[in-house]
Amino acid sequence: MARIDAFLKLGTQQGCSDVHLAVGVPPMLRMHGDLMPIKFRELRGVELEGYITEILTHAQNQLFAKGGDLDFSYVSTEGGRFRVNVYRKDTGVGATFRAIPAEVPTLEKLALPPIVAKLCDFHQGMVLVTGSTGTGKSTTLAAMIDHLNQTRRLNIISLEDPIEFVHPSKNSQVIQRELGTHIPSFAEGVRAAMREDPDVILVGELRDAETISMAMTAAETGHLVLGTLHTTSAVKTIDRVIDALPVEEREQTKSFLAQSLLAVVTQVLVKTADGHGRKAICEVLMMTKAIAKLIQTEQTHQIPTQLQMGRDLGMQLLDQALLAAITAHSVDPDDAYTYALEKRAFQKYVTDTSMLPKVDLTGSTTVPTSNSAA
């Protein structure tokens, strides 16, 4: 048993999302969004480096010895699966272990908007799931792949860095390929996947112009493409795609988005009202003729109005979704406020702006009784 497994076992037992190990501080657990130290001494440099090198392959050890960062998946002796990032910093080495649930969560369990399941019914086009690091994008995509795997007969090719959730083939065939192990880059992975008779291609991250371009080609040629971007709203997602590609391809990119982008789902993880978990709250854009025209005429700043008016199509602004979750007493109002994009407008619904304990969409006044959701 690797020595590092003891910390991972403790983290799993505590239900944490991440285990952080760094020189000069005790091991820390990410619990419901907060970083909590465990009762242990500060880790020493030589000690932690020994813990880490025990779980590396020969090739990974060579790269790490040269000062390179590492991203890989790891299965502990207890059977726990983790996504790992190993790095060096000013005081020495460090590592972050993201816990991956043993079972792929369903869309229903994640309580995502019903429109997310309907996106899995499309046969071609692009769906983007976006958000900052650690907002559950990979989990949402895994749930979508699982839904496709159970409800349709498809050839699904998933390109990941690293492989997180493992998908046994059910009604569909699921082929999972890992960056650095099976493919040299996401762009090359998409290029290869298109020669493998795919129905669905998942691209773990649209991180550069070449990958975006290849993913666009796949979506235009009759495949359903799922991908992620580190953007925090639907508008920023569209602008990022347009700006990522060469200026001379700008018109072509806008045309692609107008014709082949199906939806953008942007999510954040907000503390639940009881403080014992986090809930995904989503902004949803569904492509319409009106939004397509705004993209083509470079008036993306007007898209939020379309989201606000498009609730019958499954669309919603992030702030709308946050307010609805607060009204339903499912999330902590204080934490929800920190994710609001238009905080000044958001505050109009808050009865106590100094404490932000209660939000009421009806506009009626309510005397707050505590600093938490009722």
Tell where the protein language model's regions lie, with residue ranges.
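Short, flexible helix-loop junctions that flank or precede catalytic/ligand sites
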Residues: M1-A374
